[in-house]
Amino acid sequence: MSWQTYVDEHLMCEIEGHHLTSAAIVGHDGATWAQSTAFPEFKPEEMAAIMKDFDEPGHLAPTGLILGGTKYMVIQGEPGAVIRGKKGSGGITVKKTGQSLIIGIYDEPMTPGQCNLVVERLGDYLLEQGM
């Protein structure tokens, strides 16, 4: 299965009638493996800051998580495994796997819990596969 198929069928899938706004799978080095059409263009330093928060949980708390120029307030995640952010009626979930970051961005009517479910389910599957 291609990485694009994972994005299209597993991240951008319908859940309770709703979809993520955008999603991507990005390598730990910041290289995009696959993304949805609406996924924001991000700067290398934004991805580096996200990776640093996985190594040093709490690193992003003072500044927020920034992706594609959009700033999200960091809310409780799972240190070293999941970063969650909120901005207005939407937000972001980032799940770290052995080789990649699974990123989902949502807005209402999708809920934070639905975004977490979609992103973390794929991330857990990839971890089980050694990826």
UniProtKB/Swiss-Prot annotation:
Tissue expression notes: Pollen specific.
A GO term, aspect molecular function: actin monomer binding
The protein's name in its UniProt record: Profilin-1
GO CC term (a single one): cell cortex
Keywords for the protein's UniProt record, in alphabetical order: Actin-binding, Allergen, Cytoplasm, Cytoskeleton, Disulfide bond, Phosphoprotein
PANTHER family: PROFILIN, PROFILIN LP04
Biological function: Binds to actin and affects the structure of the cytoskeleton. At high concentrations, profilin prevents the polymerization of actin, whereas it enhances it at low concentrations. By binding to PIP2, it inhibits the formation of IP3 and DG.
